[in-house]
């Protein structure tokens, strides 16, 4: 894995420098960090050690149980987001559509489609929530990305399922043919 866990892209990231966390948030961040660090160690993924990255990670973990829990469940996902630098920029609607369509196209059956789309959705929701909690995206950008991905997920799933239905049952016709 590349420099994500040691800071790599975060040396130039727009680092939010919040005041010290209030004690309840600091305690939550500590618990969430410990859970993530343990899961990362089990997965063989080095946890964040770079100071700038760790400060941001603590802020995000303090603000979002969803992000912290997702990262603890899948530390490789966080490493992929860090290595790919996708946390550093917004995703345009066309890019969201391409990512989701590509994931849907790889699926060979409905169960795989649903699993792969859930996995991608979690990754993208974590990315979007991270950017929001870190102060790297404003509310308008966050809502636009959530909407673009929601539209893309619904559209890609419907298109793929419809294509499978057409292939197995034929194209629906009116009673007149």
Report residues per predicted region.
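Non-catalytic regulatory/linker segments of enzymes
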Residues: 1-177
């Amino acid at each position: 894995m590349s420099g994500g866990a040691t800071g790599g892209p975060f040396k130039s990231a727009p680092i939010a420098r919040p005041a010290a966390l209030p004690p309840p948030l600091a305690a939550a961040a500590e618990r969430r960090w410990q859970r993530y660090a343990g899961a990362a160690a089990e997965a063989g993924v080095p946890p964040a050690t770079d100071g700038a990255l760790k400060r941001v990670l603590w802020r995000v973990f303090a603000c979002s149980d969803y992000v912290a829990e997702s990262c603890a469940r899948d530390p490789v996902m966080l490493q992929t987001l860090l290595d790919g630098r996708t946390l550093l920029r917004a995703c345009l609607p066309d890019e969201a559509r391409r990512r989701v369509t590509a994931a849907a196209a790889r699926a060979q059956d409905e169960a795989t489609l649903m699993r792969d789309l859930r996995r991608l959705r979690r990754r993208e929701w974590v990315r979007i929530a991270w950017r929001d909690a870190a102060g790297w995206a404003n509310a308008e950008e966050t809502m636009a990305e959530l909407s673009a991905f929601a539209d893309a997920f619904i559209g890609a799933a419907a298109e793929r399922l419809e294509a499978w239905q057409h292939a197995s049952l034929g194209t629906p016709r009116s009673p007149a043919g």
